[in-house]
Amino acid sequence: GKILNIKILDKTWIIQIKTSKKFNKFLVEKASININGVSLTVSKKKSKFFEINIIPHTLKLTNLKNLKENDLVNIEFDIFGKYLHDINN
């Protein structure tokens, strides 16, 4: 995925990430997602991107504090989203 935008709201980072459209079917709001090996929650899903929120404690303990706009990140989707897709198809 690609970092589109990083906003900081009360020390929490809100990051918008764009991914290939072919992977959108695996994104589920409130489900888990791994970004660069860190397990997080999808806070919002839109047609062209999704958002994650990162609290200060997580930023302190991970490599995510080094992210900036236009960076590429490794994404691993929650198995729940994959199962949901399979059930509906």
What are these regions (language model features)?
Residues 1-89:
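Conserved loop->alpha-helix
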